[in-house]
Amino acid sequence: MRNSIFSVAGRDMAIDLGTANTLVFVRGVGIVLNEPSVVAINTRDNRPLEVGMEAKRMIGRTPSYIQAIRPLRNGVIADFDITEKMLRYFIDKVHNRRLSARPRIVICVPSGITAVERRAVEEAAYHAGARRAYTIEEPMAAAIGVGLPVHEPSGSMVVDMGGGTTEVAVISLGGIVVSRSIRIGGDELDEAIISWVKKEYNMMLGERTAEQVKMAIGSAWPYRDEPAAEVRGRDLISGLPKTIVLSSSEVREAIEEPVQSIVDAVKFTLDKTPPELAADIMDRGIVLTGGGALLRGLDMRLASETGMPIVTADRPLQSVVLGSGACLEEFDVLGVVLSSSGRA
């Protein structure tokens, strides 16, 4: 059955190549893959051992000669070779090369990246087997993915908070009118929790533990009956395992600085928005997408600080890849929002 689905010649795909997760959308099928953007490498021969979920399970648990690497940092490629290997693995996983022509590939990129960084993404796609590579800015993809009328002469505003970046953009007539891209996302929140626990409790947390704490009891706004959680790490003084109880209010204090940076980016963008478009946004609301949209109370925090209505996307984790996929499904209409170096 899988072969029959992917054997159509030139089955095109859209890829949300995120710092935390990679999602793949195949034209005519939908989302077919959602895995962590992690590669486990044997440093003795530079050979990838595992990619995706299996590689993520290895983070912090590998012998010295095996490294679990996240090849993207802050939304851009930090390790080109490893990114290419990861892309090739994901493409091969969903695309039958023996029966299919090479696909056209659309890859999402942060709105604030340089031309060199954008070109690196395209090159990684070509090296991984693309016939033609396109890029689309993440806030535009997110807006399309949540069904905002991006081609109309009215303002729509999206806040897409991913693992490495937060993208804030006002869109009208198929273009980004005002945008702000900051290299702060879910990873920064995890790091803030690690730093805070280290400072307050003399305890070191692992990356995965910090992420689990954020998802379980993290919040950007106070609420009733706030929970607490047992957290295990390593005592920095004795070097022995240690367990503490963290409250939701403590985690909120830990992540306050990066959360405020996100709020400031939204306020900056609103301040630069033309009055007519600002009026449209007041009617329609600011749409939250990305994994950060799942942070409890972020909508309340933004509503309080901006005075604007806040709407959380129905499928915040999939919004960007769904919008990129829509560009393939309706290429004649939406293809104008894509960029390409033009390499054949």
Per-region residue spans from a language model:
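Nucleotide/phosphate-binding catalytic cleft detector across ATP-hydrolyzing
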Residues: 1-161, 169-287, 293-344
